[in-house]
Structures are given as structure tokens and as C-alpha cells.
């Protein structure tokens, strides 16, 4: 008997490759950062001006001679003192009790008295519901990060953002910050507390083996989505 060996076609091999790639892509859940704006900005190039022939150049660094060094232009840097301490507690409860009772007789004709003489109907119902719930959360974040002014609003407020990355062994940790700063809240040390920043967004995350160990596997997530309980 002649044996014929069938080799997998290119279509089957391509389908297997696509399936493996899809499963590999499910191993990690992509997570978009909460800060979408650029992390830094370069100041615009100053317009070339003719030298006035004096020691002081009014166009140097874009600052007048007797002005303080607080950031106010795109590209200036500012130190953010992160001091976040948020506590939240919530509790709720519900209690409902309802009862009902109905009793009535069915009128019958005289010739049917022997058949429906005891046809009395009564119904009783009760419904009771009780539930309690509670939740609490506490978050503390302290640190410093230096950010860059990326935009100056018409009212003078500064849109800032910045990123700090730290590579520790096999893990890459980074801190991102963005918000709107009022120049009047900037101290003489060129710093401002995060509690004084409007629309503040703080992100602390990491990439590495520790972060992967805290992530649920794709097969476990698959069965978790299928489980009805």
C-alpha cells in the first residue's frame, strides 16, 4: 500500500502563527497612561536682535533685568512637591419589610352549596430585604518631581508636565505628573505643592518581573470571564 504524507499548507501554518500571536498578545493587558500630553517642551528660539552696544541684552533668556526667576515661559522648569494623603470611607444600609394578608369567601348558589360550601380563599405574603455595605480607601504619595512648562494659558497659568524614570535591577519605575500651576503659588525655592496644582494627574507605575508577577495570566482571565459566579 502506498502511503501519502500530507504536509500542512501555507494557510494552516499562517493560521497557527496568527493564533499563537493572538494568545501572546493576551498575556499582557495594555494600559494607557492617564497623562496623554507631552512630558516636556522646548522653548522657542529667540528672535535674532541687533546688539544695542550695551552690557545688558534685553533679549537674553527672555527675562527683564529686575524680574525674579520664577518659571513663566514654555521650557522653564519647576519642582513639584507631591504630598497627597486621601482617605475615604463609605457605608450604606437598607432594610425593607412588607407583609400582606387577604381572606375572602366565594359566594355560591343554593344548589351548589354542598359542592362549594367551604370554598374560602386566603392568601398571605411577606417580603423582607436587608443589606449592608461599606468601603474604605486610603492613599498616600510623597515625593518630588521636576516638571517643564509646556504651555502658558492666556490668564498666565502654567501647564506643566514631567516624567521621572528609575531603572532598579530588572524593573523600570516611572512617575508622571501634569497639571495647571498658578505662578503666585510658586515659592522662592521654585517649588509648589501638588495640593495647589489644578487638574493634577499623578501616575506611578512600573515595568518588569515584579509587575508581570502581579498580572493575571491570559488563560486564567479567560476562564474567569466564562465563570458565572
Swiss-Prot record:
Q: Which UniProt keywords apply?
A: Bacterial flagellum, Cell outer membrane, Lipoprotein, Membrane, Palmitate, Signal
Q: Name one GO cellular component term.
A: cell outer membrane
**Source superkingdom:** Bacteria
Q: Which residues form the signal peptide?
A: 1-25
Tell me the compartments it is located in: Cell outer membrane; Bacterial flagellum basal body
Single Gene Ontology MF annotation? cytoskeletal motor activity
Q: What is its main location?
A: membrane
Which InterPro entries does UniProt cross-reference here?
Flag_Lring
Q: Where is the lipid attached (S-diacylglycerol cysteine)?
A: 26
**What Pfam families does its record include?**
FlgH
Q: Where is the lipid attached (N-palmitoyl cysteine)?
A: 26
The record's Gene Ontology biological-process terms are: bacterial-type flagellum-dependent cell motility
Q: How does it sit in the membrane?
A: Lipid-anchor
NCBIfam families in the cross-refs: PRK12697.1
Q: What does this protein do?
A: Assembles around the rod to form the L-ring and probably protects the motor/basal body from shearing forces during rotation.
Q: Which family does it belong to?
A: Belongs to the FlgH family.
What subunit structure does UniProt give?
The basal body constitutes a major portion of the flagellar organelle and consists of four rings (L,P,S, and M) mounted on a central rod.
Task: Report what the protein is called.
Answer: Flagellar L-ring protein
Organism, per UniProt? Answer: Burkholderia vietnamiensis (strain G4 / LMG 22486) (Burkholderia cepacia (strain R1808))
